[in-house]
Amino acid sequence: MAKCGSCGPGYKSPLDAMKGPREEIVYLPCIYRSTGINKPDYLATVDVDPKSPTYSQVIHRLPMPNVNDELHHSGWNTCSSCYGDSSKVRNKLILPCLISSRVYVVDVGTDPRAPRLHKTVEPHEVYWKCGLANLHTSHCLGCGEIMISALGDPCGNGKGGFVLLDGETFEVKGNWEAEGETAQFGYDFWYQPRHNVMISTEWGAPKAFALGFKMEDVLAGQYGHSLNVWDWTEHRLVQTIDLGKDGLIPLEIRFLHNPDADQGLVGCALSSSIFRFYKEKDGKWAAEKVIQVPSKKVEGWALPEMPGLITDILISLDDRFLYFSNWLHGDIRQYDITNIRNPKLVGQIFLGGSIQKGGPVAVQEDKELECQPDPVTVKGKIIPGGPQMIQLSLDGKRIYVTSSIYSIWDKQFYPDMLKEGAVMLQIDVDTEKGGLKLNPNFLVDFGKEPDGPVLAHELRYPGGDCSSDIWI
């Protein structure tokens, strides 16, 4: 982490962050909900230092005090948005729960290699003070508060709102959005104060996705297809951009890291597309599709056509490359976005997925591949599931990937993963010409955990990363 006489947490700029130290440990949530194992979810600490004797191993586990929380994403008590405030210290990891609506605050400052629970925010505080539930993305704000997106109301209906936590006491302060302002659905968000804007995305109604994915729910309007544009200073919803059938279930959203940038990218899961969003001359915002992953005609699967299902995207800190995962097809892609309106595919790697050879699915028509990809084996283990959450090293030269998306959907689309556990892999990245290569020496097999196979999701470095930190 950057050090100076008067600076706060993180780094002065995205390019400064690229010069930060190499990651040595990562934190990631491990989930038992829906697996048949009645144990609490836990925060795992994994050693990713190649020089360490415990490299590629879980070195600590912090179980939560409750079961069936569905730990999912995480954020920080403070980050690079507070770089100018020397009183701020990045020492707490914020863990909102997707199903229970709890928020766990974890102390990672006292002993970074052995985190400890600092505080639990119970769901009734979120219900009563905010009228929200099903928590997802956590971002630290420049003012020192913590903002968490919500996907629904306490009854399971879709409702896109935001919970504010005090950055010191971690008490629920109330809603970020002004009274009466709400989006139809919620999921991820990213703010860009220099343009007085925040944009949020849409998954769907919790009562729909909590029971598994059904195409009927999409047709019934239970899933989102819009970007919601908020006035950052007035906390009002000022515009909704309907992405249409090419933008079904827009999930992860990333502005370019340059705080002056007035554009970014969003991944649309079901449509398997990437949209560029941008500010127009009149101050309104618009979106255009810049990448389309074609579906594959298949036999032996739930539907006659299989989408890629783009479930996570990242932009490198220098705004040169886009990375995303196709959870169903099984590949991670690298695009040169120097010309963001015309991304160029420069790297691709398959890591499992539903179309690999020897599986139940036969591909009948494929607009991209000549044959189905081979299964991937690392250290003797055939990789189950498909690549899902991805995290890029600060220097952009390594990607870490896990295979679980959400326990109910894991159970539905990759039932063997509940028996075998998720995996964590590492990919080497060519940042000159482009290219992705699997590191054969790195595997965390979550099928061998002490309490039985577990699902693993989003990754965080102690010093921040390209999806946790926002520069203002």
From Swiss-Prot:
It comes from Xenopus laevis (African clawed frog). Disulfide bonds: none annotated. It is a peripheral membrane protein. The keyword Protein transport applies. It is found in: Nucleus; Cytoplasm, Cytosol; Membrane. Signal peptide: none annotated. This is Methanethiol oxidase. GO terms for molecular function: methanethiol oxidase activity; selenium binding. Keywords: Cytoplasm, Membrane, Nucleus, Oxidoreductase, Protein transport, Selenium, Transport. Catalyzes the oxidation of methanethiol, an organosulfur compound known to be produced in substantial amounts by gut bacteria. Selenium-binding protein which may be involved in the sensing of reactive xenobiotics in the cytoplasm. May be involved in intra-Golgi protein transport. Its EC number is 1.8.3.4. GO terms for biological process: protein transport. One of its GO terms (cellular component) is membrane. It is an enzyme of class 1 (oxidoreductase). InterPro entries: Se-bd, WD40/YVTN_repeat-like_dom_sf. The keyword Oxidoreductase applies. Pfam families: SBP56 (PF05694).
